[in-house]
C-alpha cells in the first residue's frame, strides 16, 4: 500500500455562526483561524452558518415562510405588461 495518500485527519472546532455553539470533532478540513476551546487547547476554527444547535428541524422551532406573499411579489415584479 502507498503511504501518504490519505488526507490528514485532525481535531477541528466547528462554530455555529448564528448562535455561537461550538463542536470539537475530527475532520480533514483545516483553517488558518484558530480558537482556544473549552479544554484550554488551540484548534483550527471552521465557522458554519447552521448546525444541529440552530437548525429548526433539530431545535423544534419551526419558522414558517409566507410563500403566498413571496409569490405575489414575484408575479407583481415579472408581470407581463
UniProtKB/Swiss-Prot annotation:
GO terms for biological process: translation. Transmembrane segments: none annotated. GO terms for molecular function: structural constituent of ribosome. GO terms for cellular component: ribonucleoprotein complex; ribosome. InterPro entries: Ribosomal_bL28/bL31-like_sf (IPR034704), Ribosomal_bL31 (IPR002150), Ribosomal_bL31_B (IPR027493), Ribosomal_bL31_sf (IPR042105). Keywords: Ribonucleoprotein, Ribosomal protein. It holds the Pfam family Ribosomal_L31. Part of the 50S ribosomal subunit. Belongs to the bacterial ribosomal protein bL31 family. Type B subfamily. HAMAP family: Ribosomal_bL31_2 (MF_00502). This is Large ribosomal subunit protein bL31B. It comes from Borreliella burgdorferi (strain ZS7) (Borrelia burgdorferi). The lineage of its organism: Bacteria, Pseudomonadati, Spirochaetota, Spirochaetia, Spirochaetales.
Amino acid at each position: 500500500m502507498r503511504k501518504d495518500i490519505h488526507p490528514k485527519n485532525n481535531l477541528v472546532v466547528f462554530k455555529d455562526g448564528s448562535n455561537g455553539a461550538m463542536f470539537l470533532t475530527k475532520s480533514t478540513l483545516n483553517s488558518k483561524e484558530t480558537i482556544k476551546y473549552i479544554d484550554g487547547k488551540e484548534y483550527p476554527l471552521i465557522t458554519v452558518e447552521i448546525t444541529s444547535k440552530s437548525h429548526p428541524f433539530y431545535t423544534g422551532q419551526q419558522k414558517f415562510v409566507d410563500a403566498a406573499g413571496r409569490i405575489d411579489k414575484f408575479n407583481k415584479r415579472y408581470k407581463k405588461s
